[in-house]
């Protein structure tokens, strides 16, 4: 491997994918540290952690949205909105996107953009599609008839709208 790394002028870590694994671990630890600060109410430290991380990972949606969430908690509404609008389109984490969209509704409202808040809220998932509704049903052990009824309810909803 060292000879191969020399030929391609790269590191052994890069050849075997360790750099990617280390980067993921590093990003995870950054989030862990920042969220710990957030939960303690130390938003300044959480903000500093994310701002420093963005110097290394400027296009990672998790870092962008992490800073946005910290700023939202601090009350820095305008910058939080800007970062969420920047981070949401590039995020592939559906849970993260859902949480950020819901938060963004309230940030829009806080900033006086009621129309934007309503428009975004109308695109959020229905309660019937949430894990709080679906997981208890799964754990209850449904009959095939009940399963089919739930599929119908999710797909057709209350019958008042298309989606």
Regions found by a protein language model. Give the residues of each.
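Alpha-helical segment of the N-proximal tetratricopeptide repeat
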Residues: 25-56, 66
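Short coil turns that delineate tetratricopeptide repeat
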Residues: 58, 92-95, 126-129, 158-159
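Structural register within alpha-helical repeat arrays
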Residues: 33, 67, 104, 133-138
């Amino acid at each position: 491997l060292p000879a191969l790394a020399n030929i391609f002028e790269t590191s052994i870590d890069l050849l075997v994918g360790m750099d990617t694994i280390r980067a993921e671990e590093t990003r995870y630890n950054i989030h862990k540290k920042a969220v710990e600060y957030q939960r303690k109410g130390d938003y300044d430290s959480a903000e500093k952690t994310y701002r420093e991380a963005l110097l290394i990972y400027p296009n990672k949606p998790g870092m962008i949205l992490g800073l946005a969430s910290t700023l939202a908690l601090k009350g820095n509404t305008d910058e939080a909105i800007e970062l969420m609008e920047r981070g949401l389109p590039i995020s592939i984490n559906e849970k993260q996107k859902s949480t950020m969209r819901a938060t963004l509704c309230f940030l829009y409202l806080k900033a006086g953009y009621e129309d934007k808040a309503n428009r975004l809220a109308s695109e959020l998932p229905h309660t019937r599609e949430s894990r709080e509704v679906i997981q208890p049903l799964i754990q209850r052990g449904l009959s095939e008839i009940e399963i089919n009824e739930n599929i119908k309810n999710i797909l057709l909803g209350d019958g008042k709208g298309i989606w």
